[in-house]
């Protein structure tokens, strides 16, 4: 696969010096960044070149997300937290199914990618649906299966069972592309 060079006016390499580079070249080979720096220092390039507007920087990370809830956006706006949770969100979430979570995650992933977010840490139900949607979208995913039931009188043995299920989930999905 050919290396594609992207040229931009500015770039933020996120190095230890907190640099802001001008006239930046970014080389991508096989879907991975192969080189980034000032264009004047770039290696010889004979492949396709794309001129970009704006700033080149690493993708952002959403460190706390419940993306399938995009389907519930606007429900109960303006209510106090506990009223919103108990009267609006939890009843609606109780009616959701894996396909709802799949479509909600697809929508959430599309919105994040359009905003420059390339990784998300998700905490939600129907974990397999979230994995599927994330793989389809090409967004990186860290997922923590829900354990909220532990806060609602769940027995110790049931909590241990859920933790075991979480460990099994991790074994199944950790680095699914490798």
Task: Describe each model-derived feature in a short phrase.
Residues 71-103, 110, 142-163:
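Active-site gating loops and adjacent loop-to-helix segments of metal-dependent hydrolytic enzymes
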Residues 1-44:
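N-terminal metal-binding scaffold of metallo-dependent hydrolase/deaminase domains
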Residues 39-46, 132-136:
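Short loop/helix-cap segments at secondary-structure boundaries that form the rim of catalytic
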Residues 65, 123, 143-147:
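A cross-domain feature marking catalytic cores of carbohydrate-active enzymes
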Residues 129-178:
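Metal-coordinating catalytic core of metallo-dependent amide/deamination hydrolases
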Residues 118-119:
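Short acidic/polar active-site loop segments enriched in Thr and Asp
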Residues 11, 123-127:
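Short beta->alpha connector loops
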